Amino acid sequence: ITLKNKKDMETPQTGYQVKTYNVPVKRYCQTLDLRDSPELIAEYRKRHSQAEVWPEILAGIHEVGILEMEIYILGTRLFMIVEAPVDFDWDTAMARLNTLPRQQEWEEYMSILQQAAPGMSSAEKWRPMERMFHLYNT
C-alpha cells in the first residue's frame, strides 16, 4: 500500500494508524472549542492542512521535543493528542515554544477562530483532559 493509499483508507470509521517509537512515550490529551461559525471552522481546517500550516510552527513543535501531535474535530470541539518522550516537561516546552519564530503570530491568528481571548498562548487555550479509563489497567 502506498502512503497516499494508506491516508485514503484512514477515516473515523476505519481508524487512524499510529506511529511507534523506540523510546517510551507519554501522551497529553487536551480540548478547545472553535467559534460556532462554519466559515471560521473551515478556515481553521484549512490553516492546519499540510499545504497551509506554517513551516515555522511545525519546526517549533519538533524543536521543543514533541514527537506527534494530532487534532480531531467534532462540530466546534477540538481534541488534541500530543505524544512526547517520558522525560518531557510540558510547562518548560510550552514556555519555550511561545518564544520561537512566528509562534505568537500563529496563536493570535488562531484565537480569532477559537473560543479564546486574544493574547492567550497555546498552553493557556488548550484545556488538559483527565484520563478516566485505561484498558491496560483493567
State each model region's role.
Residues 28-33, 67-100:
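Short, well-ordered beta-strand segments in beta-rich or mixed alpha/beta enzyme
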